Amino acid sequence: MKLLSFGYTDVGFVRESNEDSFLVSDEKGIYAVADGLGGLPHGSLASRMAVQFFDAMIANADVCHTESELENVVKGIHRFLIENGEKVAGEDGIGTTLTVLRSAGDKVLMGHVGDSAAFVLNGNGLQKLSKDHTLEQEILDKLKPGESIEEQDLPEYYHHTLTRCL
């Protein structure tokens, strides 16, 4: 399997500060993107800590080759953010989304919390690998076959209100 990777982040036109962090490490076969929660203080710190801790937990290419190992890594990052977030921000803590990929031989493992999406570009075009953890997606998941809902029928905040984060 051939992987091509690239990382770039930009504040865009809407926000004043960029709370995104990312990691591209072809040597280790690890990739991450995190977006600090804008509703909590220290979003950029949370995303940076999550990505740096992920990098530290995967010390080399011989570590983390199963879904359960990657799940344990993400849970470890969550615990780390809870413990250290309280030191920085008190009871409110800090929060971030996190999507990580681990290239393990002929497969790619994914860990995902929040709405930082992962995509693959292949012969079928660009395909989304992750599922957003938002109120909007929760409602869409509850629809029965044949049912649909128009995007404009949902309150605006449903599109970006997270149901899961670190």
Please provide the spans of the model-predicted regions.
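PP2C/PPM-type serine/threonine phosphatase catalytic domain
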Residues: 1-166
